[in-house]
Amino acid sequence: MKLLVGILVAVCLHQYLLNADSNTKGWSEVLKGSECKPRPIVVPVSETHPELTSQRFNPPCVTLMRCGGCCNDESLECVPTEEVNVSMELLGASGSGSNGMQRLSFVEHKKCDCRPRFTTTPPTTTRPPRRRR
């Protein structure tokens, strides 16, 4: 029993010393933070609503959940598998001086997955057969 307690104390002390540097993130924390999942990103309103560029909005950017992160294979990419529309109220101002609250719709990513990358391949050209003389 004393041996078991001694081993347990040694393991705990070892873990404590490994984690003593608070600036170092452990492998599992790094892995979890890099996985393919929806994460908040700041997007300019003009990027999602280019048809409204004649207006200015306050705030000019919104925070949306978008897929991001890494896949464990270079041939895969992190893409949305489920999306949802969300409405947000923004203060809009046009060049004519009219101001008011506007409700705009944005797309958020609900679920993400690693899927094969679709690379564009150059078009193949076929030559007509050569005639023999």
Curated annotation (Swiss-Prot):
Signal peptide span: 1-20
Q: Which Pfam families does the UniProt record give? A: PDGF (PF00341)
Locations listed in the record:
Secreted
Glycosylation site list: N85
Q: Could you tell me the superkingdom of the organism this chain comes from?
A: Viruses
Query: Quaternary structure per UniProt?
Result: Homodimer; disulfide-linked.
This chain belongs to the protein called Vascular endothelial growth factor homolog
Q: Supply the source organism for this entry.
A: Orf virus (strain NZ2) (OV NZ-2)
The lineage, from the top, is: Viruses, Varidnaviria, Bamfordvirae, Nucleocytoviricota, Pokkesviricetes
